[in-house]
Amino acid sequence: MSLLILLTAVFTSTASAGAREQAKRIHDRIAGVPPSAAVLDVMAGHISNGNAILAAELAIENPSFYDVTLKNFVAPWTNEAMTPFVALNDYTATVIGLVRDERDFRQILFEDILYIGDSRLGLPAYSTTNNAHYEALEASGASLKSSLQNVAQSTYNGLPPGATAGVITSRAAAKAFFSAGTNRAMFRFTLINHMCSDLEQVADVSLPPDRIRQDVSRSPGGDSRVFLNNCVGCHTGMDPMTQAFAYYDYEYNPDTDPDGVMGQLVYNTVNDIDPDTQSRVQGKYRINSATFEPGYVTPDDRWDNYWRKGVNRRLGWDWSRSTFGYGNGAKTLGMELASSKAFAECQVKKVFKNVCLRPPSNSDDYSKVNAMESSFRSQGFNLKQVFAESAVYCAGE
């Protein structure tokens, strides 16, 4: 009898230790800091009772989930170098706020949404020409969990509500991806960050090249085969969709402000006529127009998704939308991208890698990713749930 009691005690102790170890690992992965003793006890209790998701949800309540985990998770999306070592900005803050409030995560690509610091903190006002507001918020030490306020982006950046497109029209994104160039960078990095594909992965040489702009040579180095077998693969899909950004630019003085620190997002309304195009289309859409003069001349911001045909049907476009595959402006393009299966799958894979410290690598992992994607969709695209489910799945590693 005494031996049975001893064995029972050992088994109970081992099970408890396992639950506590898993609880600590879940908390570490989600919040990036150890749990308090009291929180650890509660989390371990949830795990012992078969409610590991409740344990993960408790870890998500730690302010460090917002101040550290989410900030470092999102920051690389806001710059071309894809580094997390950048100051807090409106792009990062908006994603953090949207996750905190458990809003439909698809809204990051099309909603008239912005998160700013609480007015009671005495911060510099939000500005369209600098990042001082967010830098002061970060320096204040106030937790992003409690200090972010949701406002209408159009009220603060001057865009018409119909021209807002979530983080695409944030100041940070404009500085990084609308600055100079041809606005193709905005499309490419939206594809990388929110569809988990770079252009080479979606290249398709079978599509018509009728919307490829004049600045793309049809015979690079004197060899038209390079265009037909390489360049056309990316541009046939990219150029028609980048047309959605035809009225946007990021203006700054390259002589006095070469890095564009004091620049701002601009948008041509119906009354704005660009001197280079004699239309609302920004002059950058006529850059190097002599390279191939018979090429496409952008007349407006009408975009078309050629990838609904060909190999990129695999991205899972939403065929239930009443105006699928085309539209005007960044907002409707954002809706097109955010409604795809690839968007949902990308968010799940990114969270899995962030929490598990590795990408999905075996059949069990991919089965879990598929299950989490279904859960993500069924629960209103709540990204918190994906963090919780990923942490529970990897708790035993």
Task: Tell what function each PLM region has.
Residues 361-366:
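Generic long, charged, amphipathic alpha-helical segments
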Residues 12-14:
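N-terminal signal peptide c-region/cleavage motif recognized by signal peptidases
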Residues 54-241, 338, 342, 352-355, ...:
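Extended surface/linker regions that mediate inter-domain or inter-protein docking
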Residues 243-249:
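Short cysteine/histidine-rich zinc-coordinating motifs and their immediately flanking basic loops
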Residues 2-10:
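Bacterial N-terminal signal peptides
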Residues 170-183, 217-218, 224-226, 236, ...:
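Electron-transfer interface patches adjacent to heme c in soluble/periplasmic c-type cytochromes
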Residues 18-55, 59:
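N-terminal mature-domain "stem" immediately C-terminal to a signal peptide or N-terminal signal-anchor/transmembrane
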Residues 18-22, 328, 367-368:
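Alpha-helix N-cap/N′ positions at the starts of helices
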